[in-house]
Amino acid sequence: GCFADEYHWKDGIGPKETRKKMINTHWGGVVEDNSFGTHEFFELCEQLGCEAYVNGNLGSGTVQEMSEWVEYITFEGVSPMADLRKKNGHEKPWKLDFFGVGNENWGCGGNMNPDFYANEYRRYQTYVRNYHPDHPVSKICCGANVDDYEWTSEVLKTTHNHCLKELHGNMDGLSLHYYVHPEGWEIKGSATDFDDKVWYKSLNKALFMETLIERHGHIMDEYDPEKKIGMIVDEWGAWYTVEPGTNPGFLYQQNTMRDALIAGITLNIFNKHSDRVKMANLAQIVNVLQSVILTDGADMILTPTYHVFDMYKYHQDAMLVDSSIETETIGVEEEWQVPNLTESVSVAEDGAVHITLTNLSLDKDYEIRTILTDYQVNEVKGEIVHGEMHEMNTFETPDQVRVKEFNEVEKTAEGIRFTIPKCSVLHLEVR
Protein backbone atom coordinates (compact mmCIF):
# COMPACT_ATOMS: atom_id res chain seq x y z
CA GLY A 1 0.00 0.00 0.00
CA CYS A 2 0.96 3.62 0.58
CA PHE A 3 3.85 2.53 2.81
CA ALA A 4 5.66 1.23 -0.29
CA ASP A 5 6.59 4.69 -1.54
CA GLU A 6 8.20 5.61 1.78
CA TYR A 7 9.97 2.28 2.27
CA HIS A 8 13.72 2.02 1.82
CA TRP A 9 14.65 -1.62 1.47
CA LYS A 10 18.16 -1.37 2.91
CA ASP A 11 16.61 -0.41 6.26
CA GLY A 12 15.10 -3.92 6.36
CA ILE A 13 18.20 -6.11 5.91
CA GLY A 14 21.04 -7.15 8.19
CA PRO A 15 20.85 -7.85 11.95
CA LYS A 16 17.42 -6.89 13.28
CA GLU A 17 18.86 -5.06 16.25
CA THR A 18 20.69 -2.62 13.96
CA ARG A 19 17.89 -1.94 11.50
CA LYS A 20 16.64 1.63 11.26
CA LYS A 21 13.28 2.52 12.75
CA MET A 22 10.78 4.82 11.08
CA ILE A 23 7.30 6.18 11.63
CA ASN A 24 4.54 4.56 9.59
CA THR A 25 2.88 7.85 8.71
CA HIS A 26 0.15 6.23 6.63
CA TRP A 27 -1.06 3.46 8.90
CA GLY A 28 -1.43 4.13 12.59
CA GLY A 29 1.47 6.50 13.17
CA VAL A 30 3.36 3.72 14.91
CA VAL A 31 7.06 2.93 14.91
CA GLU A 32 8.06 0.50 12.15
CA ASP A 33 11.13 -1.41 13.32
CA ASN A 34 11.80 -3.03 9.92
CA SER A 35 12.04 -6.46 11.54
CA PHE A 36 10.14 -7.89 8.57
CA GLY A 37 12.28 -7.11 5.55
CA THR A 38 13.39 -8.68 2.28
CA HIS A 39 14.75 -11.91 3.76
CA GLU A 40 11.70 -12.43 5.97
CA PHE A 41 9.33 -11.72 3.09
CA PHE A 42 10.90 -14.29 0.79
CA GLU A 43 11.06 -16.82 3.60
CA LEU A 44 7.31 -16.34 4.07
CA CYS A 45 6.73 -16.83 0.33
CA GLU A 46 8.75 -20.05 0.43
CA GLN A 47 6.82 -21.34 3.44
CA LEU A 48 3.49 -20.54 1.79
CA GLY A 49 4.56 -21.80 -1.63
CA CYS A 50 3.38 -18.61 -3.30
CA GLU A 51 4.76 -16.30 -5.96
CA ALA A 52 6.51 -13.11 -4.87
CA TYR A 53 5.13 -9.65 -5.70
CA VAL A 54 7.37 -6.80 -4.52
CA ASN A 55 6.44 -3.12 -4.80
CA GLY A 56 9.25 -0.64 -5.44
CA ASN A 57 9.52 2.91 -4.10
CA LEU A 58 9.05 5.30 -7.01
CA GLY A 59 7.47 8.08 -4.95
CA SER A 60 10.41 8.96 -2.69
CA GLY A 61 13.12 6.52 -3.78
CA THR A 62 15.72 6.70 -6.51
CA VAL A 63 16.20 4.70 -9.67
CA GLN A 64 19.44 3.36 -8.22
CA GLU A 65 17.70 2.20 -5.03
CA MET A 66 15.10 0.28 -7.02
CA SER A 67 17.71 -1.18 -9.36
CA GLU A 68 19.88 -2.33 -6.47
CA TRP A 69 16.94 -4.01 -4.75
CA VAL A 70 16.22 -6.12 -7.82
CA GLU A 71 19.93 -6.95 -8.06
CA TYR A 72 20.00 -7.90 -4.36
CA ILE A 73 17.02 -10.21 -4.79
CA THR A 74 17.78 -11.87 -8.11
CA PHE A 75 21.45 -11.66 -9.17
CA GLU A 76 23.44 -14.85 -8.71
CA GLY A 77 26.95 -13.75 -9.71
CA VAL A 78 29.49 -11.41 -8.18
CA SER A 79 28.21 -7.86 -7.64
CA PRO A 80 27.96 -5.39 -4.76
CA MET A 81 24.31 -6.24 -4.03
CA ALA A 82 24.68 -10.00 -4.53
CA ASP A 83 27.68 -9.94 -2.20
CA LEU A 84 25.64 -8.00 0.37
CA ARG A 85 22.84 -10.58 0.19
CA LYS A 86 25.34 -13.38 0.75
CA LYS A 87 26.87 -11.48 3.67
CA ASN A 88 23.38 -11.29 5.17
CA GLY A 89 23.01 -15.05 5.02
CA HIS A 90 21.34 -15.97 1.73
CA GLU A 91 23.75 -17.44 -0.80
CA LYS A 92 21.35 -18.06 -3.66
CA PRO A 93 19.09 -15.43 -5.21
CA TRP A 94 15.33 -15.61 -4.84
CA LYS A 95 12.78 -15.90 -7.62
CA LEU A 96 11.06 -12.57 -8.09
CA ASP A 97 7.86 -13.04 -10.06
CA PHE A 98 6.26 -9.58 -10.07
CA PHE A 99 7.62 -6.10 -9.40
CA GLY A 100 5.37 -3.08 -9.01
CA VAL A 101 6.99 0.15 -10.18
CA GLY A 102 5.37 2.45 -7.64
CA ASN A 103 2.00 2.23 -5.91
CA GLU A 104 -0.99 4.57 -6.15
CA ASN A 105 1.20 7.26 -7.65
CA TRP A 106 -1.93 9.23 -8.50
CA GLY A 107 -2.32 9.75 -4.72
CA CYS A 108 -0.22 8.71 -1.73
CA GLY A 109 2.59 7.57 -4.03
CA GLY A 110 3.45 11.10 -5.12
CA ASN A 111 0.24 12.87 -6.28
CA MET A 112 1.46 12.63 -9.86
CA ASN A 113 -0.50 13.29 -13.00
CA PRO A 114 -0.63 10.39 -15.47
CA ASP A 115 1.82 11.79 -18.01
CA PHE A 116 4.44 12.54 -15.35
CA TYR A 117 4.06 9.10 -13.76
CA ALA A 118 4.23 7.36 -17.14
CA ASN A 119 7.54 9.03 -17.94
CA GLU A 120 8.86 8.15 -14.49
CA TYR A 121 7.69 4.57 -15.06
CA ARG A 122 9.59 4.41 -18.35
CA ARG A 123 12.77 5.51 -16.59
CA TYR A 124 12.50 3.38 -13.45
CA GLN A 125 11.42 0.17 -15.17
CA THR A 126 14.50 0.33 -17.40
CA TYR A 127 16.58 -0.64 -14.39
CA VAL A 128 14.29 -3.40 -13.14
CA ARG A 129 16.52 -5.86 -14.91
CA ASN A 130 15.89 -9.48 -15.81
CA TYR A 131 19.02 -11.21 -14.54
CA HIS A 132 17.50 -14.63 -15.30
CA PRO A 133 16.04 -14.92 -18.82
CA ASP A 134 14.37 -18.18 -17.80
CA HIS A 135 12.71 -16.45 -14.80
CA PRO A 136 11.80 -12.96 -16.05
CA VAL A 137 10.41 -10.37 -13.67
CA SER A 138 6.92 -9.21 -14.67
CA LYS A 139 6.77 -5.43 -14.40
CA ILE A 140 3.55 -3.92 -13.07
CA CYS A 141 2.71 -0.33 -13.97
CA CYS A 142 0.57 1.74 -11.60
CA GLY A 143 -2.94 1.89 -12.99
CA ALA A 144 -6.05 3.80 -12.09
CA ASN A 145 -7.94 4.59 -8.94
CA VAL A 146 -11.44 3.19 -9.52
CA ASP A 147 -13.00 4.89 -12.58
CA ASP A 148 -10.19 7.26 -13.53
CA TYR A 149 -10.26 6.25 -17.18
CA GLU A 150 -8.17 9.27 -18.16
CA TRP A 151 -5.30 7.87 -16.07
CA THR A 152 -5.43 4.58 -17.95
CA SER A 153 -5.57 6.28 -21.32
CA GLU A 154 -2.78 8.79 -20.67
CA VAL A 155 -0.43 6.28 -19.02
CA LEU A 156 -0.79 3.84 -21.89
CA LYS A 157 -0.38 6.61 -24.46
CA THR A 158 2.87 7.84 -22.90
CA THR A 159 4.38 4.44 -22.18
CA HIS A 160 3.65 3.20 -25.70
CA ASN A 161 4.96 6.33 -27.43
CA HIS A 162 8.37 5.73 -29.07
CA CYS A 163 8.29 2.15 -27.80
CA LEU A 164 8.65 -0.94 -29.94
CA LYS A 165 5.25 -2.52 -30.45
CA GLU A 166 6.43 -5.91 -29.23
CA LEU A 167 7.49 -4.40 -25.88
CA HIS A 168 3.90 -3.43 -25.01
CA GLY A 169 4.89 -0.23 -23.24
CA ASN A 170 7.59 -2.08 -21.29
CA MET A 171 4.98 -3.48 -18.93
CA ASP A 172 3.48 -6.87 -18.20
CA GLY A 173 0.59 -5.59 -16.13
CA LEU A 174 -1.41 -2.48 -15.30
CA SER A 175 -2.90 -2.28 -11.83
CA LEU A 176 -6.41 -1.30 -10.73
CA HIS A 177 -7.60 -0.52 -7.18
CA TYR A 178 -11.25 -0.60 -6.12
CA TYR A 179 -12.91 -0.99 -2.73
CA VAL A 180 -16.54 -1.34 -1.71
CA HIS A 181 -17.38 1.51 0.72
CA PRO A 182 -21.09 0.98 1.52
CA GLU A 183 -21.73 4.51 2.82
CA GLY A 184 -18.92 6.41 1.09
CA TRP A 185 -15.26 7.22 1.70
CA GLU A 186 -15.52 9.46 4.77
CA ILE A 187 -17.96 7.36 6.80
CA LYS A 188 -17.72 3.89 5.34
CA GLY A 189 -20.27 2.12 7.52
CA SER A 190 -20.15 -0.67 10.07
CA ALA A 191 -18.86 -4.12 9.17
CA THR A 192 -21.56 -5.79 11.28
CA ASP A 193 -24.41 -3.34 11.91
CA PHE A 194 -26.27 -2.81 8.64
CA ASP A 195 -29.79 -3.19 7.27
CA ASP A 196 -31.34 -4.59 4.09
CA LYS A 197 -30.78 -1.33 2.21
CA VAL A 198 -27.06 -1.32 2.97
CA TRP A 199 -26.83 -5.03 2.09
CA TYR A 200 -28.04 -4.44 -1.46
CA LYS A 201 -26.10 -1.18 -1.76
CA SER A 202 -22.91 -3.04 -0.85
CA LEU A 203 -23.54 -5.80 -3.38
CA ASN A 204 -24.40 -3.25 -6.06
CA LYS A 205 -21.04 -1.60 -5.47
CA ALA A 206 -19.30 -4.97 -5.65
CA LEU A 207 -20.91 -5.56 -9.05
CA PHE A 208 -19.42 -2.25 -10.27
CA MET A 209 -16.14 -4.15 -10.59
CA GLU A 210 -17.40 -5.54 -13.90
CA THR A 211 -17.99 -2.07 -15.31
CA LEU A 212 -14.49 -1.04 -14.27
CA ILE A 213 -12.90 -4.07 -15.90
CA GLU A 214 -14.85 -3.59 -19.11
CA ARG A 215 -14.20 0.15 -19.46
CA HIS A 216 -10.52 0.07 -18.47
CA GLY A 217 -10.18 -3.06 -20.59
CA HIS A 218 -11.62 -1.27 -23.61
CA ILE A 219 -8.92 1.41 -23.30
CA MET A 220 -6.25 -1.27 -22.90
CA ASP A 221 -7.56 -2.97 -26.06
CA GLU A 222 -6.70 0.14 -28.07
CA TYR A 223 -3.02 -0.25 -27.21
CA ASP A 224 -2.89 -3.97 -26.53
CA PRO A 225 -5.50 -5.83 -28.60
CA GLU A 226 -3.67 -9.13 -28.09
CA LYS A 227 -4.05 -8.78 -24.33
CA LYS A 228 -0.37 -9.19 -23.56
CA ILE A 229 -0.70 -6.72 -20.69
CA GLY A 230 -2.59 -8.15 -17.76
CA MET A 231 -5.05 -6.14 -15.72
CA ILE A 232 -3.75 -6.55 -12.17
CA VAL A 233 -6.51 -5.86 -9.63
CA ASP A 234 -4.06 -5.88 -6.76
CA GLU A 235 -6.28 -4.11 -4.22
CA TRP A 236 -9.95 -4.99 -3.90
CA GLY A 237 -12.50 -5.89 -1.26
CA ALA A 238 -14.82 -4.32 1.30
CA TRP A 239 -13.61 -1.41 3.41
CA TYR A 240 -15.68 -0.50 6.46
CA THR A 241 -15.27 1.70 9.52
CA VAL A 242 -12.80 0.02 11.89
CA GLU A 243 -14.03 -1.96 14.87
CA PRO A 244 -14.65 0.19 17.97
CA GLY A 245 -11.60 0.53 20.20
CA THR A 246 -9.05 -0.32 17.50
CA ASN A 247 -6.44 1.94 15.92
CA PRO A 248 -8.09 3.66 12.91
CA GLY A 249 -4.87 3.19 10.94
CA PHE A 250 -4.80 -0.57 11.42
CA LEU A 251 -8.03 -1.08 9.40
CA TYR A 252 -9.25 -3.99 11.53
CA GLN A 253 -12.80 -5.05 10.66
CA GLN A 254 -15.11 -8.03 11.13
CA ASN A 255 -16.37 -10.20 8.29
CA THR A 256 -19.96 -11.39 7.74
CA MET A 257 -22.05 -13.16 5.13
CA ARG A 258 -22.15 -9.84 3.29
CA ASP A 259 -18.40 -10.24 2.73
CA ALA A 260 -18.91 -13.82 1.57
CA LEU A 261 -21.27 -12.54 -1.12
CA ILE A 262 -18.93 -9.69 -2.07
CA ALA A 263 -16.13 -12.22 -2.47
CA GLY A 264 -18.23 -14.65 -4.53
CA ILE A 265 -19.64 -11.93 -6.78
CA THR A 266 -16.21 -10.43 -7.41
CA LEU A 267 -14.47 -13.74 -8.04
CA ASN A 268 -17.17 -14.69 -10.55
CA ILE A 269 -16.50 -11.40 -12.35
CA PHE A 270 -12.75 -12.01 -12.37
CA ASN A 271 -13.26 -15.51 -13.74
CA LYS A 272 -15.44 -14.28 -16.59
CA HIS A 273 -12.85 -11.64 -17.54
CA SER A 274 -9.79 -13.83 -17.11
CA ASP A 275 -8.65 -13.06 -20.65
CA ARG A 276 -7.64 -9.63 -19.36
CA VAL A 277 -7.56 -9.94 -15.55
CA LYS A 278 -4.36 -11.90 -14.91
CA MET A 279 -4.02 -11.31 -11.17
CA ALA A 280 -6.37 -10.20 -8.40
CA ASN A 281 -5.21 -9.64 -4.83
CA LEU A 282 -7.71 -9.31 -2.00
CA ALA A 283 -6.78 -6.53 0.41
CA GLN A 284 -5.78 -7.86 2.78
CA ILE A 285 -5.09 -11.31 4.15
CA VAL A 286 -4.81 -11.09 7.96
CA ASN A 287 -6.47 -8.58 10.33
CA VAL A 288 -6.78 -5.82 7.70
CA LEU A 289 -9.93 -4.95 5.72
CA GLN A 290 -11.67 -7.96 4.11
CA SER A 291 -9.38 -10.51 5.72
CA VAL A 292 -9.52 -14.26 5.29
CA ILE A 293 -7.99 -14.70 8.76
CA LEU A 294 -8.46 -12.80 12.02
CA THR A 295 -6.14 -13.29 14.99
CA ASP A 296 -6.18 -12.44 18.67
CA GLY A 297 -2.88 -13.32 20.27
CA ALA A 298 -2.35 -17.02 19.64
CA ASP A 299 -5.98 -17.54 18.55
CA MET A 300 -7.04 -17.57 14.90
CA ILE A 301 -10.37 -17.76 13.11
CA LEU A 302 -11.30 -18.18 9.46
CA THR A 303 -13.71 -15.63 8.05
CA PRO A 304 -16.66 -16.21 5.68
CA THR A 305 -14.44 -14.74 2.95
CA TYR A 306 -11.87 -17.47 3.60
CA HIS A 307 -14.47 -20.17 3.05
CA VAL A 308 -15.58 -18.64 -0.26
CA PHE A 309 -11.97 -18.58 -1.46
CA ASP A 310 -11.65 -22.20 -0.39
CA MET A 311 -14.59 -23.16 -2.61
CA TYR A 312 -13.38 -21.11 -5.57
CA LYS A 313 -9.86 -22.57 -5.60
CA TYR A 314 -11.00 -25.21 -8.11
CA HIS A 315 -11.21 -22.56 -10.83
CA GLN A 316 -7.49 -21.87 -10.58
CA ASP A 317 -5.58 -23.17 -13.63
CA ALA A 318 -8.86 -24.45 -15.12
CA MET A 319 -10.36 -23.45 -18.48
CA LEU A 320 -13.10 -20.82 -18.50
CA VAL A 321 -16.38 -21.98 -20.02
CA ASP A 322 -18.90 -19.61 -21.57
CA SER A 323 -21.91 -19.40 -19.29
CA SER A 324 -24.97 -17.27 -18.72
CA ILE A 325 -27.87 -17.25 -16.31
CA GLU A 326 -31.38 -15.81 -16.38
CA THR A 327 -31.80 -13.27 -13.60
CA GLU A 328 -34.32 -10.91 -12.12
CA THR A 329 -33.67 -7.55 -10.49
CA ILE A 330 -34.02 -7.33 -6.72
CA GLY A 331 -33.35 -4.80 -3.97
CA VAL A 332 -34.93 -2.22 -1.70
CA GLU A 333 -33.94 1.12 -3.21
CA GLU A 334 -34.27 1.82 -6.92
CA GLU A 335 -30.74 3.21 -7.18
CA TRP A 336 -29.12 0.10 -5.72
CA GLN A 337 -30.90 -2.76 -7.49
CA VAL A 338 -28.91 -5.93 -8.23
CA PRO A 339 -29.36 -9.15 -10.21
CA ASN A 340 -30.49 -11.98 -7.97
CA LEU A 341 -27.78 -14.39 -9.17
CA THR A 342 -24.22 -14.43 -10.53
CA GLU A 343 -22.17 -17.36 -11.84
CA SER A 344 -18.97 -18.57 -13.44
CA VAL A 345 -18.02 -21.97 -14.84
CA SER A 346 -14.74 -23.70 -15.64
CA VAL A 347 -13.48 -27.12 -16.69
CA ALA A 348 -10.53 -28.59 -14.82
CA GLU A 349 -7.73 -30.59 -16.40
CA ASP A 350 -9.37 -33.83 -15.23
CA GLY A 351 -12.61 -32.92 -17.05
CA ALA A 352 -14.64 -31.91 -14.01
CA VAL A 353 -16.98 -28.94 -14.49
CA HIS A 354 -16.89 -26.43 -11.63
CA ILE A 355 -19.88 -24.12 -11.22
CA THR A 356 -19.92 -21.28 -8.69
CA LEU A 357 -23.06 -19.27 -8.01
CA THR A 358 -24.14 -16.53 -5.65
CA ASN A 359 -27.69 -15.83 -4.50
CA LEU A 360 -27.84 -12.15 -3.56
CA SER A 361 -31.40 -12.26 -2.23
CA LEU A 362 -32.03 -11.92 1.49
CA ASP A 363 -35.41 -13.63 1.41
CA LYS A 364 -35.83 -15.89 -1.61
CA ASP A 365 -34.47 -19.27 -2.73
CA TYR A 366 -34.28 -19.92 -6.48
CA GLU A 367 -34.70 -23.11 -8.46
CA ILE A 368 -31.90 -23.46 -11.01
CA ARG A 369 -32.17 -25.61 -14.11
CA THR A 370 -28.89 -25.94 -15.97
CA ILE A 371 -28.19 -26.98 -19.53
CA LEU A 372 -24.76 -28.54 -19.96
CA THR A 373 -24.10 -28.72 -23.68
CA ASP A 374 -22.52 -31.95 -24.92
CA TYR A 375 -21.92 -33.18 -21.38
CA GLN A 376 -23.23 -36.32 -19.71
CA VAL A 377 -23.69 -35.89 -15.96
CA ASN A 378 -22.64 -38.89 -13.90
CA GLU A 379 -21.87 -37.42 -10.50
CA VAL A 380 -22.39 -34.12 -8.69
CA LYS A 381 -20.78 -32.90 -5.48
CA GLY A 382 -21.76 -29.65 -3.84
CA GLU A 383 -20.63 -27.35 -1.05
CA ILE A 384 -22.14 -24.13 0.20
CA VAL A 385 -21.60 -21.14 2.46
CA HIS A 386 -24.87 -19.57 3.59
CA GLY A 387 -26.60 -17.98 6.53
CA GLU A 388 -28.29 -14.86 7.81
CA MET A 389 -26.72 -11.65 6.52
CA HIS A 390 -25.12 -10.68 9.84
CA GLU A 391 -23.67 -14.10 10.64
CA MET A 392 -19.94 -14.09 11.31
CA ASN A 393 -17.22 -16.09 12.98
CA THR A 394 -15.92 -14.84 16.31
CA PHE A 395 -13.33 -16.15 18.72
CA GLU A 396 -16.21 -17.42 20.86
CA THR A 397 -18.08 -19.01 17.91
CA PRO A 398 -15.41 -19.67 15.25
CA ASP A 399 -17.53 -22.01 13.08
CA GLN A 400 -20.77 -20.07 12.79
CA VAL A 401 -20.12 -19.65 9.05
CA ARG A 402 -18.37 -22.51 7.32
CA VAL A 403 -18.48 -24.69 4.22
CA LYS A 404 -21.22 -27.33 4.37
CA GLU A 405 -22.12 -30.18 2.05
CA PHE A 406 -24.81 -29.48 -0.51
CA ASN A 407 -26.45 -32.65 -1.81
CA GLU A 408 -29.82 -31.41 -3.09
CA VAL A 409 -28.94 -31.74 -6.78
CA GLU A 410 -30.99 -33.72 -9.27
CA LYS A 411 -29.70 -34.98 -12.61
CA THR A 412 -31.85 -34.16 -15.63
CA ALA A 413 -31.75 -35.02 -19.32
CA GLU A 414 -30.13 -31.65 -20.08
CA GLY A 415 -27.93 -31.17 -17.03
CA ILE A 416 -28.82 -30.68 -13.37
CA ARG A 417 -31.51 -29.06 -11.24
CA PHE A 418 -31.30 -27.67 -7.72
CA THR A 419 -32.46 -24.84 -5.48
CA ILE A 420 -29.93 -22.30 -4.26
CA PRO A 421 -30.79 -20.90 -0.81
CA LYS A 422 -31.05 -17.20 -0.10
CA CYS A 423 -27.91 -15.35 0.96
CA SER A 424 -25.48 -18.03 -0.19
CA VAL A 425 -22.42 -18.89 -2.25
CA LEU A 426 -22.46 -22.33 -3.88
CA HIS A 427 -19.87 -24.52 -5.59
CA LEU A 428 -20.82 -27.60 -7.63
CA GLU A 429 -18.42 -30.15 -9.10
CA VAL A 430 -19.99 -32.04 -11.99
CA ARG A 431 -18.49 -35.14 -13.56
Please place each PLM-identified region on the residue numbering:
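Alpha-helical scaffolding within the catalytic cores
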Residues: 33-41, 76-91, 148-165, 265
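Aromatic/acidic polysaccharide-binding cleft in carbohydrate-active enzymes
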Residues: 191, 228-343
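Aromatic- and acidic-residue-enriched carbohydrate-binding clefts of CAZyme catalytic domains
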Residues: 2-38, 79-107, 182-197
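Structural recognition of the beta-strand scaffold that forms the well-ordered cores
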Residues: 52-55, 97-101, 138-141, 173-176, ...
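Noncatalytic carbohydrate-binding groove/subsite architecture in carbohydrate-active enzymes
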Residues: 114-264, 326-336
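Conserved, mostly hydrophobic/aromatic
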Residues: 45, 69, 99, 174, ...
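Aromatic-lined substrate-binding rim segments of carbohydrate-active enzymes
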Residues: 5-75, 117-138
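C-terminal beta-sandwich/jelly-roll accessory domains of carbohydrate-active enzymes
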Residues: 324-328, 333-338, 358-431
